[in-house]
Amino acid sequence: MRYLYLHGFASGPRSRKAQAFQRSFEQRGIELSIPELDQGDFAHLTISAQLNLVNQLLAGEPARLIGSSMGGYLAALYASTHPEVDRLVLLAPAFDFSSRWEAITGPEKLAAWHDTGWLEVFHYGQQTIERVHFDLFEDARKHAPNPDFRQPARIFHGTHDEVVPIGLSRAFAASHPNADLTELESDHELLNVLDSIVGAAVPFLVA
């Protein structure tokens, strides 16, 4: 069984959430892989390229996935077409990814992104301002906004999330009995409840 953690947008393998999960897995003697999803080229990041990377890493092997924000959306997309994935843990999954970009940037900034080809964002993993190409948005629109996976899943989402509204996870869980939603008094980062999430999620994954 392979275990993979998929980090969020403009994040990386050294994020606090990724490292908390890795420590918990290490304590159980289990390897948790945490790939750098942009493969060193954040500027040309796309959903399709990240899915291809996951496919290359897993190579059809049985797997269980953890995904945070954009990584949660990736995990859901991948699981929807790969039955060898048999369990998922999603942290504030960024369902309806392209529409969230429209809402966050607003029409003027989105138009400028389209016209110039570039958008500047703060990269939390590198602690710098980085550019990302409009291909990210165009490519995201090609993918299902709410991936219809049927594997057992635990979803953890903060009720005060202003980046990815909890309503997206509520709607998904309401239409997917395989997905159990835990609502938490937290924001998008979920850092104040991270220990409890790890404590609940890891036993579910390694059982």
Model regions and ranges:
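Gly/Ala-rich beta-loop-alpha elbow adjacent to hydrolase catalytic centers
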Residues: 66-75
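The alpha/beta-hydrolase serine catalytic core
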Residues: 85-87, 91-175, 179-207
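Aromatic pocket-lining residues of Rossmann-like dinucleotide-binding sites
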Residues: 25, 78-82
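Short, surface-exposed "cap/lid" segments of acyl-processing enzymes
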Residues: 1-39
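Active-site loop/turn elements of alpha/beta-hydrolase fold enzymes
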Residues: 34-40, 93, 186
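Short, surface-exposed alpha-helical segments at coil->helix boundaries
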Residues: 15-22, 48, 166-170
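Catalytic nucleophile-loop/oxyanion-hole region of alpha/beta-hydrolase
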Residues: 35-58
